[in-house]
């Protein structure tokens, strides 16, 4: 059976940041909440199976919460930045936790759906200079990050025959 990789680089880190900065005490939902995120993956798994393919999920890459915070607050006033930090509970680490929550949901979904998942997160975290794997926005893979992921995927594909020829 042919296998197909299901890769979605986004996590739940897409919010209306300007709206949050203007009203940090309000209720704010991500552009794609966790339920919709899992449903999107579940649909993609079902589509692959409907086409006679075996789906294989790929975990999310790492992110750098401090760089991402700087990126999403560029152009904001100091007060807006403080408001956003307030909404995050006073720590940019909350951004990493949200990202990790979405990534962990992929591993749970893989187990529930009985599909393989390729862990690209761990080799990135194991890198001595993981910050070099990301662009300045803290979430986009740099050329070095893309190379690490490509190497990891190639190794696993070769070793375990994850893609049929």
Where do the protein language model's features map onto the residues?
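Alpha-helical cap/lid subdomain in secreted, periplasmic
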Residues: 1-143, 147, 151-165
């Amino acid at each position: 059976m042919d296998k197909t990789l299901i890769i979605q680089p986004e996590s739940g880190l897409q919010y209306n940041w300007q709206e949050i900065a203007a009203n940090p005490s309000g209720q704010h939902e991500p552009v794609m909440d966790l339920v919709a995120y899992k449903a999107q993956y579940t649909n993609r798994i079902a589509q692959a199976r409907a086409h006679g393919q075996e789906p294989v999920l790929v975990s999310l890459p790492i992110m750098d919460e401090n760089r991402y915070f700087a990126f999403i607050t560029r152009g904001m006033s100091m007060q807006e930045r403080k408001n956003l930090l307030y909404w995050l509970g006073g720590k940019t680490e909350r951004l990493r936790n949200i990202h990790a929550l979405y990534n962990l949901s992929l591993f749970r979904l893989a187990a529930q759906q009985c599909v393989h998942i390729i862990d690209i997160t761990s080799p990135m975290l194991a890198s001595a200079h993981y910050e070099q794997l990301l662009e300045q926005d803290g979430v986009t893979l740099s050329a070095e990050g893309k190379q690490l992921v490509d190497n990891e995927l190639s190794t696993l594909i070769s070793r375990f025959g994850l893609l049929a020829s």
